[in-house]
């Protein structure tokens, strides 16, 4: 698998506080990479660097290099709209817009200037099917998306992210606010989709990381401690601190 996103010596500071210390990490195309580590270790901060979601935070400074398909995303030639079209995001709390399921999923297409109603209809249906929420919504496309359960709302958000056909989807603890059944359904969806898209997922749930990810990266206090194939890391981590974390000795 080729590398689709690469991070080289990435440092991030909020004023005088340095949250990330020289992260070097490559993400392979059409795999799911889990970012794990204790609360406050920099997982979500790093994730948000990958499509520049940190840009509007006051007093933030980012150095180093992050490339998407070989292009420096912090370079002057980077089109931010194009970047976020290709690198979508799903947040911890379900965030459907306060309008219909159809309009939620079609939103990105319309913003991108797609006017072909037939194409939009087709893409909405395809995306809802990909996110495993079509059966629950096909007869309720005009219903307010916020009227659905939390797990259903999160799958609608995944469908919304997929509708513009991104190459990468960033997931910031996408199941942490959901019940176990809804979490399991989201995991099944990711397993079905991870050979079509590249997923990078922050999770506190080590069992979840073990179940769904191909690669895992362990962060601690803003440092990348270890990264590699999930099965190898979970069975035979190279660092003692990784073993301690995976075995619940802290975190």
Swiss-Prot record:
GO cellular component: plasma membrane
Any single GO BP term: phosphate ion transmembrane transport
Reaction(s) the record says it catalyses: phosphate(out) + ATP + H2O = ADP + 2 phosphate(in) + H(+)
Membrane topology: Peripheral membrane protein
Location(s) in or outside the cell: Cell membrane
Domain of life per record: Bacteria
Keyword tags: ATP-binding, Cell membrane, Membrane, Nucleotide-binding, Phosphate transport, Translocase, Transport
UniProt: ATP binding residues: 37-44
Domain ABC transporter: 5-246
Entry-linked PROSITE patterns: ABC_TRANSPORTER_1, ABC_TRANSPORTER_2, PSTB
InterPro entries: AAA+_ATPase, ABC_transporter-like_ATP-bd, ABC_transporter-like_CS, P-loop_NTPase, PstB-like
EC number: 7.3.2.1
Molecular-function annotations in GO: ATP binding; ATP hydrolysis activity; ATPase-coupled phosphate ion transmembrane transporter activity
NCBIfam families: 3a0107s01c2
PANTHER family the record matches: ABC TRANSPORTER I FAMILY MEMBER 17 (PTHR43423:SF1)
Subunit composition and interactions: The complex is composed of two ATP-binding proteins (PstB), two transmembrane proteins (PstC and PstA) and a solute-binding protein (PstS).
Family: Belongs to the ABC transporter superfamily. Phosphate importer (TC 3.A.1.7) family.
Protein's job: Part of the ABC transporter complex PstSACB involved in phosphate import. Responsible for energy coupling to the transport system.
Protein name, per record: Phosphate import ATP-binding protein PstB 2
Organism field: Lactobacillus acidophilus (strain ATCC 700396 / NCK56 / N2 / NCFM)
Name of the gene: pstB2
């Amino acid at each position: 698998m080729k590398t689709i996103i690469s991070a080289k010596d990435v440092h991030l500071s909020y004023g005088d506080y340095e949250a990330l210390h020289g992260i070097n990490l490559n993400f392979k195309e059409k795999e799911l990479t889990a970012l794990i580590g204790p609360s406050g270790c920099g997982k979500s901060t790093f994730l948000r660097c990958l499509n520049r979601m940190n840009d509007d935070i006051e007093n933030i400074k980012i150095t180093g290099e992050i490339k998407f398909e070989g292009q420096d995303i912090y370079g002057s030639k980077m089109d931010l709209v194009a970047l976020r079209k290709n690198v979508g995001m799903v947040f911890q709390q379900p965030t459907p817009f306060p309008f219909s399921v159809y309009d939620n999923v079609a939103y990105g297409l319309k913003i991108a200037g797609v006017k072909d109603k037939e194409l939009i209809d087709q893409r909405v249906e395809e995306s809802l099917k990909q996110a495993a929420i079509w059966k629950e919504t096909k007869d309720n496309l005009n219903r307010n998306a916020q009227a659905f359960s939390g797990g259903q709302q999160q799958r609608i958000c995944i469908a919304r992210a997929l509708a513009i056909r991104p190459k990468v989807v960033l997931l910031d603890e996408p199941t942490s606010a959901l019940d176990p059944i809804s979490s399991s359904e989201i995991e099944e969806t990711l397993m079905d989709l991870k050979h079509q898209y590249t997923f990078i997922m922050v999770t506190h749930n080590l069992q979840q990381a073990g179940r769904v990810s191909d690669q895992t990266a362990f962060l601690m206090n803003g440092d990348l401690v270890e990264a590699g194939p999930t099965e190898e890391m979970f069975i035979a981590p190279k660092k003692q601190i990784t073993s301690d974390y995976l075995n619940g000795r802290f975190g």
